[in-house]
Amino acid sequence: EVHSDRYFKPHFQSQPVTKDKEQDLYDRIARALMLTDVEREHLFLLGLGRAPEVRYHRSEGVTPRLQRVLDLLEPHPAIIRTATWDVVAWNRAATVMLTDYGALPPRERNVLRFMFLDPRVRAAQHDWASVARFVVGAFRVDAARAGAAAEVQPFVDELCRLSPEFAALWRDNDVRAHGEAIKQLRHPILGPVRFEYSAFAVDGRSDLSMIVYNPVDPEVKEKIRGLMEASPAHEHA
């Protein structure tokens, strides 16, 4: 068994120790040993007593198993989104109640794009101004937590150019937590509907979150089933 105190820490005894130097040494060890992300994190916890700085990995999709989980949640709308709020998976209930993600190019499947650039999504919000402020604040937190601040900057710059409202909210530097709450929508067919929503981390995929929407009114579930039966099916991605 390799003990990190014995083999790694003496490297620093004859020179000033900085966080960057420690991070660099342990990163080099992890690369030399070809450690997985989980093994790399364990190495840092053993040697430094803390997790390493987050390394962001862009997600392009989900496994078939995760997609089956989403499908089994129907008629509850559910999506999986990245730390940069790109929607990478969804079920048919989400298609009929939220957005027809399958009809959009992958680049356009972003919650902030919907919120600030799609008039239909804006009109569907019960209180667009409050929802928009929450979305921007929660997005800022998620991107920073995932170590994706640099990756999202071009997207943020683009959205600032396209939406003065987004630009103003971004300048406010507000931060929000994404947990559990009530979402109210104006659906074009069902009218006003309310959902309890919860956000869940996807185990082993720190870059992904699953959002599940539970209808507050029980009769809405059967109405969602009816919409699903009447709507053509799209590919998941």
Residue ranges of predicted features:
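Short amphipathic recognition helices of helix-turn-helix/homeodomain-type DNA-binding modules
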Residues: 21-61
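Small/flexible residues
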Residues: 8, 42, 185-189
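Short, flexible active-site loop motifs that bind/organize anionic cofactors or intermediates
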Residues: 16, 30-33, 85, 180
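Hydrophobic protein-protein interaction segments
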Residues: 59, 64-237
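Recognition helix of helix-turn-helix/homeodomain-like DNA-binding domains
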Residues: 2-20, 30
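Functionally constrained cores in energy, signaling, and assembly domains
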Residues: 2-3, 26, 47-49, 76, ...
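Residues at alpha-helix boundaries and short interhelical turns
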Residues: 16, 33-37, 102-105, 146
